[in-house]
Amino acid sequence: MEFFSTNNLTAVGSSSSSAQCHPIQRCLLYDFCCIFVKGRSIAQNIRGGTIRLEGATVLSKRYRAAIKRSLKLLEQNDSSKTSSGKNVQQLGEELCSFSLLWSLIEAVTFRPSQNLIVVDLLEWAHECFPSTQSLIPSVQSNHLRDSNFLGTVMEELMQQERPEDHESYWNSVLRQMLCADFSSVLTLLQFHSAFKNDEALLKMAKILQSVNVSLFKYDRTNCDEFLALRKKVCDLTAHKQMFRSHDNLGVICSLLIGDRGTFKKYFDLFRPNWFEVFPAFLLFFYPSSTGEQMPKVIENFFNLVSVRRDKLSQLEQTILSIVEFDLIKGLRLICSAGQSACWFATHLVDLLHFHDSNFLNPTLTATLPSGGAQKLLDGFSKDSADFDLRSRLLVEYAQLLFQDDQLWEIAAEYLIASGLGSVGQRILDQLVSQFNWRGNTSVAQRLLTICDRYELGTAREDILRSLVLMLCRQGEWTSALGWALQMSSNELTVNVSRRILEGAISPDRIGQMRIFEALDDQFVNCSELVLLYKFYTFKRLLLEGELRQAVHILHELFIDNSSPVEFHAVLFEEMIRILCSFQQPLVGLDVLNPEEMISPGLDRELVQDMFRSLSMLHLQQQLLATKSRSGGSRSVERPTKALFPPNDSMAQSDELSERVTNLMETLRPMLTQALANCFLD
């Protein structure tokens, strides 16, 4: 069955925003990230950055355990389809394939070099095919076989008085033996009704137990004990004819001593996947083989069981490459599977790199595919062709993670660990900057956290700009100003402040802008923000009853010609309110002492300044109105593109002019009276 197919991609890496990976798979990738980070921590604390065999094995087992947990969760999952439309069973089959490959690479790579390869492969087979019913898809079928096949057979046979009378009993025994699963064969033989009294059965059980012990002992550097036991079996069958009354026990003996005809006969009968029985073939016929001899051994095996290399699926080709100790070819097949295998290839290559950095050097891996990473790398470095496979895979995987709205946060870990230095940081800067946070301010804040952690200046400014503009469109001017203040430039701060001064929010709301309480000296360089801060202070002083101080600040705002006309209208309204308050008894004064009911005191020069400012503003408004009326009939002013388009339509301009004129007419006599009172004082 073709497992690595670009038609069956996992959701990670899907270019479609609607295609998201299954929640269980997402948890798996988070688990892998935690193990990845742990591996980096271990490598950094070791001289040379190379993880010892024991450490690499521990990390490898953790990766495999994470895949197995995901498989168990999928078995318990009720949904038949993932959110990307993928069949849950199909996803389970893919994870089974990856589990099989990872454990096989672990068996042939993270092992003492002096150990016999046959024992490591037998352990791999026993772990992956515990019932010899493959946990991965059969080559002959399109469905997962029952992983508890042997347990089901045993449960049925236990209820029978004579299990050996049933064909399924001996089929199970011989199939287990074909795979060199001696423990299962021994267990099944014990269900034989005559087991306790039959000398041949007892003898066979003892032999199988001895074989099992001899193979999986602590010292795995030789198979002398196994060869001695096999010679003993030859003697029992040839000379003593111990098993002549038990045809099936005779088959077991024939397999054990390496009879090719028997092996082929039962392989053709049961038709298991070739890689399930290859470790047994290696034990029965070439137990002392080394890694260098494996290609020749496999050729003999394929000739015996009539398997053709050109008919192998991509999964089988990958397994074959690994068993032949051609791991580079195996990695090429894995990497060529596309995005579906990227997460698997990335973590596998990373672990191999830190176990032996020379093994995956750029020369050996230069021809290995790396998806879309190369194009991205080319845009950041002229020497990108010299980057090793690990770096290229980490970049590609990070790209894919940024395409999933719940996995993007872990992408930074991979880019920073890529060893690309400033190139990796610039790539991360671009990916964060281009990430679509869909107007979610919570996501934007998390992106900004990444920017601060890894000093991503460009991305930080882009996100803040987008955030400010979005809040302005939503009318959230106070929040927009708060985010604009976090930018390195004053451009947006100036624009947002000016729009607030022009009336984007009410004067009372300006007095509630608590962001000014936490400001430092950064607003000194922005005149618009200074005006806002002064007006905020003015409103706060009014609320606190500090009229004298409030009037002095209002005076400063009044004589500042940098503020927009709309803001002057606001100042007029505030001045009118204050002057009106002078004509009312002030709250809090003692009504029994009316002589103390005096105004807070308007300074003569202060009133004169306000009067002059009012006159100049009135004259300016008249000139602007005249120019607008005369120019409007002759030409239409070409619109200019601005960050915040001003509200400068003809109707709004006329309305504002009329409003300012009315306010000035109201304010002028009040200021005149206030000035007269000052002179009378």
Give short role names for the model-derived ranges.
Residues 1-7, 12-15, 19-61, 67, ...:
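Long alpha-helical scaffold regions
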Residues 1-132, 287-344, 383-407, 420:
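Long, acidic/serine-threonine-rich intrinsically disordered regions with weak helical/coil propensity
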Residues 50, 54-57, 61, 65, ...:
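Short helix-adjacent coil turns
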Residues 100-155, 340-369, 429-444, 505:
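Short, charge-rich, low-complexity alpha-helical interaction segments
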Residues 156-214, 315-337, 395-419, 430-431, ...:
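Extended amphipathic alpha-helical scaffold segments
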Residues 170, 241, 245-467, 570-571:
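Extended alpha-helical solenoid scaffold regions that build the rod-like backbones
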Residues 184-186, 330-333, 345, 361, ...:
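Solenoid-repeat scaffolds in large eukaryotic assemblies
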Residues 192-216, 331-358, 419-437, 488-507, ...:
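Short, charge-rich amphipathic alpha-helical segments embedded
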